[in-house]
Amino acid sequence: MKKVVKFGGSSLASAEQFKKVGNIIRAEESRRYVVPSAPGKRFSADTKVTDMLYGCYAAAENGEDFTEKLAAIKDRYQEIIDGLGLKFSLDEDFEVIRKNFSEKAGSNYAASRGEFLNGKIMAAYLGFEFIDAAEVVRFDESGDFQSEITNGIMSARLEKAKNAVIPGFYGATEEGRVVTFSRGGSDITGSLVARAVNADLYENWTDVSGFLIADPRIVKGSKSIETITYKELRELSYMGASVLHEDAIFPVRRAGIPINIRNTNAPADKGTLIVEATCCQPKYTITGIAGTDGFAAITIEKAMMNSEVGFCRKVLQVFEDNGVSIEHMPSGIDTMTIFVHKDKFEEKEQQILAGIHKAVDPDHIELESDLALIAIVGRGMKSTRGTAGRIFSALAHAHINVKMIDQGSSELNIIVGVRHDDFKNAIKALYEIFVLTQI
């Protein structure tokens, strides 16, 4: 068996955390390829190393003396090295960083050094080969990631390495200019490595024991999800659930490699297994609940709307022309409601309203802002009668008015719209009826 293991910043914030990671890797020989993040916070008031690097480079870019800022970063790493008892020095690496900062190497280069340096320490600690991600993760000159080229380069390079540490978050152009993924991009690197070596499993280690059914900031003591499909994960991630960078899904999904979300601080926990498909029946009707607020609804009314050929297309064209994407579009015979992100809509509100009037000459347009959308997601819904009824019942019992409901033809998810003020109570009510009352 062959595993790729990625560890997040909180898992590598200190020497003590490094030791936990070392124990996890050494516990199974199959954990052959390691993708580390930069050191995260050691305590709530602490600063992540990536943020320290951004601040240090900003000072350098402004022509300020950045010596103390760079020394503070070096101290963070030295503390880890000393705590691990390593006879290992990063002096040469920091001298190169100092020189490149002075020569304005760029913020992408600056941010990437957190993973680069942590990777060097990890390789020394484990006795694994260190492979600079700049050698195997390729971007074009525009900064766009090159998936297939990366897979070819990485596959050929890792084929020669029995065990290796590959820093996450960054890569480089063919000319060597460092480019980073978006924040949290080490998840993507782990996924790319898993695909390149055709791993049996991609373990993503963080500070939580997998995905939770609902946001723990809203639902205290939310239960964890044992198994989730890629489709379910995509639906939940789109509506705000976050543990894994959503772009990390595609490389391993394409290769048919499952992902296991694990907890560095509780390695005995099984975590959440993410798979393409499963015959396992879920414990609950739903797999998860996720939502986000900040939406607006535009309701358009016109008599005989359903008889007017091209009505919807004309309305949608107005939104497209103004660069505003549409989230959901429930409709009736003579009405259609369009849900959009409030901030995007407000930037072009008058142009869009004028465009709708010109395009379809509606009888009436009504606007409503400060709305939230909640997704109830689960493969178990397809074989369960009365799911929508239970949703309405739960929300009615909590005195919450439903502004919109939309169910996809796959029966994988149901979206409900509620007022912003009802958002948290709605999630609590849905969790109670689908999880707590089903125990």
Q: What does each model-identified segment do?
A:
Residues 39-40, 208-210, 259, 263-268, ...:
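Glycine-rich beta-alpha junction loops
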Residues 270-439:
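A conserved regulatory-domain signal marking ACT and ACT-like small-molecule sensing domains
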Residues 2-3, 31-34, 128-129, 162-165, ...:
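Structural motif
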Residues 41, 137-139, 210-211, 267-269, ...:
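Short secondary-structure capping/turn micro-motifs that flank functional sites
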Residues 244-246, 255, 265-272, 346-349:
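Surface-exposed amphipathic alpha-helical tracts and adjacent flexible/coil segments at the periphery
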Residues 1-244, 249, 341, 417-419, ...:
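Nucleotide/pyrophosphate-binding catalytic subdomain
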